[in-house]
Amino acid sequence: MNTIWIAVAAISLLGLAFGAILGYASRRFAVEDDPVVEKIDEILPQSQCGQCGYPGCRPYAEAISCNGEKINRCAPGGEAVMLKISELLNVEPQPIDGEEQELAPARVVAVIDENNCIGCTKCIQACPVDAIVGATRAMHTVMSDLCTGCNLCVDPCPTQCISLQPVAETPDSWKWDLNTIPVRIIPVEHHA
């Protein structure tokens, strides 16, 4: 019985010692992130679609901050994201690159023609935001609330049954961009 307690104490002390060493090393050798990259990354839509030419939103944010990359290459974010980045960096806004040249681009979502879907799951694997649901050899469908319209699911489909359809804004589907609404603190008087 005595040897069990010795073993438990020895392992506990080893765990405590290694934890202290790891804690010290993580603080001593910590790499500080660029705060500008962090802010740009927060503004980007995090769809990781690659339409900007980078493998995800974080590498694009690093390229904007460190390499002077154009701020107008995020198609899913559109003009709103470009304007926020230009305001953050205090640079001139630029027209949106690529196919998103319109002033107010229409929101599009992927639509699957379920009669032609063979259930291969290639679209599910390609979707960066997990907006497509279905199982192998079963019908797939797109959850339109989650779809960013990034177009990454269209090309892998072997039966070409996926298309992008514009979504009309209705009072039910339209979402406020709360970050563009100015907020003021109004003093309130309390009367007894």
From Swiss-Prot:
<keyword id="KW-0677">Repeat</keyword>
<keyword id="KW-0472">Membrane</keyword>
<feature type="binding site">
    <location>
        <position position="52"/>
    </location>
    <ligand>
        <name>[4Fe-4S] cluster 1</name>
    </ligand>
</feature>
<dbReference type="GO" id="GO:0046872">
    <property type="term" value="F:metal ion binding"/>
</dbReference>
<keyword id="KW-0249">Electron transport</keyword>
<feature type="binding site">
    <location>
        <position position="123"/>
    </location>
    <ligand>
        <name>[4Fe-4S] cluster 2</name>
    </ligand>
</feature>
<keyword id="KW-0004">4Fe-4S</keyword>
<dbReference type="GO" id="GO:0051539">
    <property type="term" value="F:4 iron, 4 sulfur cluster binding"/>
</dbReference>
<dbReference type="InterPro" id="IPR050395">
    <property type="entry name" value="4Fe4S_Ferredoxin_RnfB"/>
</dbReference>
<feature type="domain" description="4Fe-4S">
    <location>
        <begin position="32"/>
        <end position="91"/>
    </location>
</feature>
<keyword id="KW-0997">Cell inner membrane</keyword>
<dbReference type="GO" id="GO:0022900">
    <property type="term" value="P:electron transport chain"/>
</dbReference>
<dbReference type="Pfam" id="PF04060">
    <property type="entry name" value="FeS"/>
</dbReference>
<feature type="domain" description="4Fe-4S ferredoxin-type 1">
    <location>
        <begin position="108"/>
        <end position="137"/>
    </location>
</feature>
<feature type="binding site">
    <location>
        <position position="57"/>
    </location>
    <ligand>
        <name>[4Fe-4S] cluster 1</name>
    </ligand>
</feature>
<feature type="binding site">
    <location>
        <position position="150"/>
    </location>
    <ligand>
        <name>[4Fe-4S] cluster 3</name>
    </ligand>
</feature>
<dbReference type="GO" id="GO:0009055">
    <property type="term" value="F:electron transfer activity"/>
</dbReference>
<feature type="binding site">
    <location>
        <position position="120"/>
    </location>
    <ligand>
        <name>[4Fe-4S] cluster 2</name>
    </ligand>
</feature>
<keyword id="KW-1003">Cell membrane</keyword>
<keyword id="KW-0408">Iron</keyword>
<dbReference type="GO" id="GO:0005886">
    <property type="term" value="C:plasma membrane"/>
</dbReference>
<keyword id="KW-0411">Iron-sulfur</keyword>
<keyword id="KW-0813">Transport</keyword>
<feature type="binding site">
    <location>
        <position position="157"/>
    </location>
    <ligand>
        <name>[4Fe-4S] cluster 2</name>
    </ligand>
</feature>
<dbReference type="InterPro" id="IPR017896">
    <property type="entry name" value="4Fe4S_Fe-S-bd"/>
</dbReference>
<dbReference type="InterPro" id="IPR010207">
    <property type="entry name" value="Elect_transpt_cplx_RnfB/RsxB"/>
</dbReference>
<keyword id="KW-1278">Translocase</keyword>
<feature type="region of interest" description="Hydrophobic">
    <location>
        <begin position="1"/>
        <end position="26"/>
    </location>
</feature>
<comment type="subunit">
    <text>The complex is composed of six subunits: RsxA, RsxB, RsxC, RsxD, RsxE and RsxG.</text>
</comment>
<protein>
    <recommendedName>
        <fullName>Ion-translocating oxidoreductase complex subunit B</fullName>
        <ecNumber>7.-.-.-</ecNumber>
    </recommendedName>
</protein>
<dbReference type="InterPro" id="IPR017900">
    <property type="entry name" value="4Fe4S_Fe_S_CS"/>
</dbReference>
<keyword id="KW-0479">Metal-binding</keyword>
<comment type="function">
    <text>Part of a membrane-bound complex that couples electron transfer with translocation of ions across the membrane. Required to maintain the reduced state of SoxR.</text>
</comment>
<feature type="binding site">
    <location>
        <position position="153"/>
    </location>
    <ligand>
        <name>[4Fe-4S] cluster 3</name>
    </ligand>
</feature>
<feature type="binding site">
    <location>
        <position position="74"/>
    </location>
    <ligand>
        <name>[4Fe-4S] cluster 1</name>
    </ligand>
</feature>
<dbReference type="InterPro" id="IPR007202">
    <property type="entry name" value="4Fe-4S_dom"/>
</dbReference>
<dbReference type="Pfam" id="PF14697">
    <property type="entry name" value="Fer4_21"/>
</dbReference>
<feature type="binding site">
    <location>
        <position position="147"/>
    </location>
    <ligand>
        <name>[4Fe-4S] cluster 3</name>
    </ligand>
</feature>
<comment type="similarity">
    <text>Belongs to the 4Fe4S bacterial-type ferredoxin family. RnfB subfamily.</text>
</comment>
<feature type="binding site">
    <location>
        <position position="117"/>
    </location>
    <ligand>
        <name>[4Fe-4S] cluster 2</name>
    </ligand>
</feature>
<feature type="binding site">
    <location>
        <position position="49"/>
    </location>
    <ligand>
        <name>[4Fe-4S] cluster 1</name>
    </ligand>
</feature>
<dbReference type="InterPro" id="IPR016463">
    <property type="entry name" value="RnfB/RsxB_Proteobac"/>
</dbReference>
